[in-house]
Amino acid sequence: MEESSGLSSMKFFSDQHLSYADILLPHEARARIEVSVLNLLRILNSPDPAISDLSLINRKRSNSCINKGILTDVSYIFLSTSFTKSSLTNAKTAKAFVRVWKVMEICFQILLQEKRVTQRELFYKLLCDSPDYFSSQIEVNRSVQDVVALLRCSRYSLGIMASSRGLVAGRLFLQEPGKEAVDCSACGSSGFAITGDLNLLDNTIMRTDARYIIIVEKHAIFHRLVEDRVFNHIPCVFITAKGYPDIATRFFLHRMSTTFPDLPILVLVDWNPAGLAILCTFKFGSIGMGLEAYRYACNVKWIGLRGDDLNLIPEESLVPLKPKDSQIAKSLLSSKILQENYIEELSLMVQTGKRAEIEALYCHGYNYLGKYIATKIVQGKYI
Amino acid sequence: MENNAPVPKLLLQLISSAFQRCRLAEDLCRLSVLLDQSTERDPPITCISIADTGIGCNLEEFQNLRCPREFNGAKIWDGLLSVKTTCFTDDEVYYYHINLDEYIANKRLKRQPSQAKNGAKFSGTEVSLSVFGSMDVLVAPIIGFFQKIIVLQILNVTLDLMVKQGTSPGNQTQYVFAVNADKTPCFTASNLERLKSGLEDYVLRHANCLDTMCDYCFSDREHLKVGSGTVCQEDKHKRVGGTMEVVIVISDLLESTQHCSRSCNGKTEVLYFDNFLPSPVPHLALSALKKIDWKKYGLILANVNDQDGHVFLEWDNFPSYVQIQIALHWYHNQYPTRQKNGPGISLLKKGIKNALDNLKAKHEGFLLSSHSRKICSYVPDLARSIAGLIFSSTDLDFQGDCLSVLGFQTQEVERDTVENYIQRKIVTVIGMNERKPQKDQEAAPFLFFDGESETSFFEDEEVEGEYYSSSLE
């Protein structure tokens, strides 16, 4: 089935059907929950009683659209206005329906106390209260996203924090309100942890003399680059999300990109479809959290690894693509969001059936990584 | 014993006729059966008398009666019925001998001298006969028949059975079958009302084996859930129309039931009445019972046990403390009629279905399909969360709005009350949705938006590898 791609000639208006989650204050979020309770009760106790269905913004690929920026260089994925229906009387959705109300109940209490909890904490709370409904973190996360899609307010607005995995290091000073500034070049090789508190991130003052922001897929590579203080040679800030980026790390990067709009953001990932998918999550946002992720899309550039780096890598370091890789590749190719040269790279991966990890560059010595990045920057080889 | 089998059948036919004569009389009537076994003879002879004070008989009813003199090589009776009958307007009591063994019509009936009534005004009939053998095999079928007849609660007829063995008064037993006095519908109640009340009694009194309600099983009638359905068939092309009435009683027995001698094993007895008389369940009714979509009512029919029209339904996964009792009654709109057409299968099915739906409508959350029962199992948790949302709020306006929407007056109402109310309400809606025909099931309103956008079904499983997944940390 042909997906609606949003690639119409009316590009200015391509996002007019954008659905989004508002960022709300606790009392505003509470008010939305209260309205949903009242609506439910009203319909339940009306002369023609019914159990209201939950209309959730569809978080499927079929409801995703792409906004290709014309006036800006940022493109992003957003969710359009199709809904899914979660109904108590449908066997398929009955449990999910109850889960939504359970999550709303807990969020309501959190909001009343003006506290914030992580999804992990939420999971344990729900596991204790309602073990019949929540058996895994995934179920909790999905229900949280259902509540986001129902109330159309961001997860953070519900009092739920993204427990961030993000780290930052290099030529950046961060000053949280009422605290002393932190020098991210002096935090050791483990870097400075990005908080999951989006509000705090929003109020943090940032200063830098860096010329580049470099995102590294893997924690080990981040660690190597920071330990070698590569940011002394290349004036830059390193960020890693240790894999697929959480919302807080994306939020942080987006904040940096708007604070320092002239700094190019370069991404160093493995040469495999998953690496490209991670890059794309920074670049375009994601469908799963599509109601809020689109806000944090940044125009990142792909610095490596890429097909023309393969000559730097010994043949034996190339390993065959896994079935999961092929799946991701297929999904990416059909997404219609990739620019031409990304498609070429992806096709090359599929064609050769091989993948390569950044660590393969260590065959030239541990300090080669810094030189590799420097060379790429000097030659302007990022796409 | 077996060689006497035609006799009980003949007796029940005679009793049935007598009962109909009583039923059609407008007055209070009595139907007495006497079994008198002489102890001096070997083999014993039992004299039988069936006497009623109903309208007089018209002899036609004996036309088709048959009963062989011998059965399995043994002589069972002399083939002779003696009948005395008189109508209210008659001046005398007519007396006949009817030889059931005679197939030539005019030799069959022999009129005997009549007796003058001397101006007395009464009506009635007495049929007597003598059979060889002990009366033991006759008592049980007659009692069983009477126990069923009184389910119909035909109030103007009293039934009794006298069993005599020899002349000594110590060897006499009298059984009286009367309608239970504690909740008797009035004379003008409809047939259906009486059948309902009668079937309730039948259950409470253990198939009418007891004189009063079984205290072990029931503390009161509230343990019974009753549903009824009626379907009428119009008169058509000289065919006399009829009415199909179905009553279903479900009893939630008490835990103490296990102390009770009668155990139902969760089986369902089906009583069938044909024109006000207990009758074996006909094949069409059996097929109808098999064709009912029981799953719609959360029941799984495991087996239909048919022993010569005595039918039990057996269920799968059925709680043993719940008992279902079904009574079907088919009668012609005109009576008496020579026609003997029974109800069609669709009429039977419709009647049973109506009764089930009626029961379901009257008792919230009862007889729900397994699907709805599963959904209902989530409702307490859902209600708890919603009540939690209302009562954890610090916003008194919001709380007040919620309570007033639910129809509670004061702010002082307890959380449990509200929670229970919400729970009951949701279960009611689930039950209502189930009763609506599929095509009438409109989509439930959305919580926020009026669903004008394209909607699709919620898929619970995220598609693996679809695009790149978002981090759900």
UniProtKB/Swiss-Prot annotation, chain A:
It is found in: Nucleus. Residues 24-167 form the Topo IIA-type catalytic domain. Coiled coil: none annotated. Changing residue 124 to F: Loss of double-strand breaks induction. Belongs to the TOP6A family. This is Meiotic recombination protein SPO11-2. InterPro entries: Spo11/TopoVI_A, Spo11/TopoVI_A_N, Spo11/TopoVI_A_sf, TOPRIM_Topo6A/Spo11, WH-like_DNA-bd_sf. Its EC number is 5.6.2.2. Keywords: DNA-binding, Isomerase, Magnesium, Meiosis, Metal-binding, Nucleus, Topoisomerase. One of its GO terms (molecular function) is ATP binding. The active site is at 124 (o-(5'-phospho-dna)-tyrosine intermediate). One of its GO terms (cellular component) is chromosome. It is an enzyme of class 5 (isomerase). It catalyses: ATP-dependent breakage, passage and rejoining of double-stranded DNA. Disruption phenotype: Plants show a semi-sterile phenotype and a drastic decrease of meiotic recombination, indicating that SPO11-1 and SPO11-3 are not functionally redundant. SPO11-1 and SPO11-2 are both required for double-strand breaks induction. Drastic decrease in chiasma formation at metaphase I associated with an absence of synapsis in prophase, due to the inability to make double-strand breaks (DSB). It holds the Pfam family TOP6A-Spo11_Toprim. Very low expression in flowers and shoots. Its cofactor is Mg(2+). Heterotetramer of 2 SPO11 (SPO11-1 and/or SPO11-2) and 2 MTOPVIB chains. Interacts with MTOPVIB. May form a heterodimer with SPO11-1. Interacts with PRD1. Does not interact with TOP6B. Mg(2+) binds at residues 217, 270. Component of a topoisomerase 6 complex specifically required for meiotic recombination. Together with MTOPVIB, mediates DNA cleavage that forms the double-strand breaks (DSB) that initiate meiotic recombination. The complex promotes relaxation of negative and positive supercoiled DNA and DNA decatenation through cleavage and ligation cycles. It comes from Arabidopsis thaliana. One of its GO terms (biological process) is embryo sac development.
Swiss-Prot record, chain B:
Expressed ubiquitously in different tissues, including roots, stems, leaves, seedlings, inflorescences, siliques and pollen grains, specially as a higher level in inflorescence. InterPro entries: MTOPVIB_plant. Its main location: nucleus. Disruption phenotype: Defective in meiosis. Sterility due to male and female gamete developmental defects leading to disturbed embryo sac development and abnormal pollen formation. Strong reduction in bivalent formation at metaphase I caused by defects in meiotic double-strand breaks (DSB) formation. Impaired homologous chromosome synapsis and recombination. Despite a weak sequence similarity, retains most of the structural features of the ancestral archaeal Top6B subunit (AC O05207), including the transducer domain that interacts with the SPO11 subunit and the ATP-binding fold, also named GHKL fold. Component of a topoisomerase 6 complex specifically required for meiotic recombination. Together with SPO11 (SPO11-1 and SPO11-2), mediates DNA cleavage that forms the double-strand breaks (DSB) that initiate meiotic recombination. The complex promotes relaxation of negative and positive supercoiled DNA and DNA decatenation through cleavage and ligation cycles. Heterotetramer of 2 SPO11 (SPO11-1 and/or SPO11-2) and 2 MTOPVIB chains. Interacts with SPO11-1 and SPO11-2. Binds to PRD1. Belongs to the TOP6B-like family. This is Type 2 DNA topoisomerase 6 subunit B-like. It comes from Arabidopsis thaliana. The lineage of its organism: Eukaryota, Viridiplantae, Streptophyta, Embryophyta, Tracheophyta.
